[in-house]
Amino acid sequence: MNYFTLNKHSRASRFNMIKHKRSLHQPESFPAPLKRKNFNTMRIKFPLLLLLIPFFWGCKHEKLDNKPLISVSIEPLRNIVEHLAGDYYKVVTLTPVGASPETYEPTPKQLMDVSNSKLYFAIGTLGFEKQQLERMKETAPTLKIYTVSDGISLLSVQHEGHGDSTDPHIWMSPKNVVQMARNVCNALCQNDPEHTAVYKKKLADLERHADETDRRIRLMVSKVRYRNFLIYHPALAYFANEYGFRQLTIEQDGKEPSSEHLATIISEAKAAEVHIIFLQREFKGRSVKSFSEATGARVVIINPLAYRWDNEAIATAKALAAQCI
């Protein structure tokens, strides 16, 4: 046996000994080839799961999108209709956030949504409604249109910006909201009698919430001394009438006031001890700054077209109550 052969056998023996020692520390149940195989399988399945997620997600949303449509004019009305019918209908608003319902022109897509709707709920006195309702009847003859202001005593405003001198912001009074909801509920029960019990239960819930909102507002404004306020666009006639306030309007015939009108309103505001000026979010109201500087009144931004009509009414009451502080 030569040196090479001897070293060959020695090296083999040492290798076998090392291999034996390693095997004592390595669990038999974890063979390397099996681990690699499972990893490869996971690499195949994981992308497959990613591909399937949109399918299941799409199925879920397809089910939601298959709800029949109801169209409404403004966001506060969508709040009411969704509370009553949201379980069975998808509710869409014709006037987007930030747009004026007095002058807004619906887009072709919005008019398409209206034509595909089962029902349409209108305030009945908004500027764009007067222009668009007749067109809706022509393009969608099967569409059923309901006016939610039925049964509500409409109030006049100080200028002609609302057409028939009528303030359309009926939802700024919680009591009016109750009547609006009752009108919606009656229409839903007529067209979907199968769910009458649900609609009436939801109506009762909304009535309780409106009553609680009214109670909170009365409590907040009960000790307010200054009962007059300025507002750029006359949107709080129903709120003022309900809670014992008087609104003075800056806007003249739907436009910025003339210098003569400006001077008259400033004089009247000073005499009436006005301490607050409301400015709606969708209006620029360039003259409001002049009124504020001339009268010392604080400017408060409001959004009567907000989805949460209740929060907006309470925020208005808080602003009026803060005059006492």
Question: Model-found features: residue ranges?
Answer:
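Short hydrophobic transmembrane-like helices used for membrane targeting/insertion
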Residues: 1, 17-18, 42-44, 53
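Low-complexity, intrinsically disordered or signal/transmembrane-proximal segments
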Residues: 3, 9, 20, 25-26
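Short hydrophobic targeting helices and cationic amphipathic motifs
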Residues: 3-4, 26, 31, 39
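Intrinsically disordered, low-complexity segments enriched in serine/proline and basic residues
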Residues: 6-8, 15, 33-36
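N-terminal leader/targeting signatures
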Residues: 11, 26, 34-35, 51-52, ...
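Bacterial N-terminal signal peptides that target proteins for export
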Residues: 36-47
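Extracytoplasmic metal-acquisition and chelation regions
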Residues: 59-325
